[in-house]
């Protein structure tokens, strides 16, 4: 890939999340001559407007790319080592990019939380990506980096202390402050629409192992109704991102040769508190649609709202002797926009700059980048990975 003009192309640079990625690249790497990057989108005029509004150097190239024109996409893909795309829903706008990256040995990162589409892309392009050396990494935003890397971080500690992994981990969202992503809501709508055309996707969405290359593990703990978590002494509610996060965690386990074990169980829920108040809150959360008030795609919260947001996720490893080891992952901005834009930018740079020995294939964040990405996220992106008593 030494003949590529750029390390990273930010595709979707004129969209709301794309602009946040551009702003982060400018602030974090604008003076770093070892990283070359470009902005790409459908409208040259809008690219100029974003560049000038953010004060991006005119040395940063602007690439006009038509998402409906495969030759236009191929031209972009062949100029860069990695395509960072924020243009979703990916089942509508991502297929040609994945296809071209897999064919041309170009790395790829996205914010995808669409398991049906991911399942199709794995089946169609994973083998070619292995042949060409393309490293394609889905879900490099709030879904699913804090969860995928949180489980990975905790399992590494469990193995260091006990010599073997925990067979059961509970993910528990303790805090999540900030607006939900309009892109997430649009992706959910697109997924619902695709089910009408492809009813076979129901099985993919319902199966926690549907991204696990044919492996079927043990029955997983139910997560679709409020329950009382006896060990934490709190009520927990269904977490709307669990369907994608759990699939990615199980895929990571497969890609790392069952590092967590073939009997591994993982479920993910949202802490609501103890007592009758906690029960009522859990039942309310379980009955609501958290994405109903999400911004429209292309829109998003104010800078103040993003900076005042945060999140905190607890991970509990239940060991055979009855003891539990806890770890937590937290972020310093709202999950859907501020933190997500930093996570995907660091993922792209980590992949290109720090993973020369990673072979081609379709990955989740943990097996692709592991400790290297954790270190970057802690150093640069406001995430904290820690053990707790």
Predicted features by range, described:
Residues 89, 100-118:
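ADP-ribose/adenylate-binding Rossmann-like module
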Residues 6-27:
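N-terminal Rossmann NAD(P)H-binding glycine-rich loop of SDR-like oxidoreductase domains
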Residues 50-57:
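Short, conserved SAM-binding/catalytic segment
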Residues 18, 131, 156-389:
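C-terminal catalytic/substrate-binding lobe primarily of soluble NAD(P)-dependent oxidoreductases
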């Amino acid at each position: 890939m030494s003949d590529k003009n750029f390390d990273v192309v930010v595709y979707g640079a004129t969209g709301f999340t794309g602009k946040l990625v551009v702003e982060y690249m400018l602030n974090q790497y604008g003076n770093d001559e070892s990283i070359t990057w470009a902005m790409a989108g459908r409208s040259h005029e809008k690219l100029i407007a974003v560049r000038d509004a953010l004060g991006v150097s005119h040395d940063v190239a602007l690439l006009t790319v038509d998402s409906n024109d495969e030759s236009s996409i191929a031209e972009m893909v062949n100029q860069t080592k990695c395509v960072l795309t924020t243009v979703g829903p990916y089942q509508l706008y991502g297929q040609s990019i994945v296809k071209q990256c897999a064919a041309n040995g170009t790395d790829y990162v996205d914010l995808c939380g669409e398991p049906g589409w991911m399942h199709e892309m794995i089946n169609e392009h994973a083998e070619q990506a292995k042949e060409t050396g393309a490293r394609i990494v889905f879900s490099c935003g709030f879904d699913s980096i804090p969860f995928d890397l949180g489980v990975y971080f905790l399992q590494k500690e469990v193995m260091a202390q006990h010599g073997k992994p925990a067979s059961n981990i509970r993910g528990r969202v303790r805090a999540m402050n900030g607006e939900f992503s309009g892109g997430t809501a649009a992706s959910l709508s697109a997924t619902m629409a695709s089910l009408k055309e492809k009813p076979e996707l129901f099985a993919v969405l319902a199966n926690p192992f549907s991204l696990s290359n044919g492996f079927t593990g043990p029955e997983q703990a139910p997560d679709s109704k409020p329950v009382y978590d006896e060990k934490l002494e709190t009520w927990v509610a269904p977490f709307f991102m669990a369907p994608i996060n759990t699939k990615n965690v199980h895929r990571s386990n497969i890609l790392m040769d069952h590092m967590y074990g073939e009997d591994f169980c993982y479920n993910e829920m949202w802490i609501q508190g103890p007592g009758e108040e906690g029960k009522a809150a859990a039942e309310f959360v379980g009955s609501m649609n958290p994405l109903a008030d999400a911004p429209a795609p292309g829109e998003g919260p104010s800078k103040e709202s993003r900076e005042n947001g945060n999140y905190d996720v607890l991970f509990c490893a239940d060991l055979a002797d009855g003891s539990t080891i806890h770890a937590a992952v937290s972020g310093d901005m709202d999950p859907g926009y501020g933190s997500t834009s930093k996570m995907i930018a660091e993922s792209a740079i980590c992949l290109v700059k720090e993973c020369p020995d990673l072979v081609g294939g379709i990955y989740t964040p943990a097996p692709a980048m592991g400790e290297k990405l954790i270190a970057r996220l802690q150093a640069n992106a406001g995430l904290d990975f820690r053990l707790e008593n």
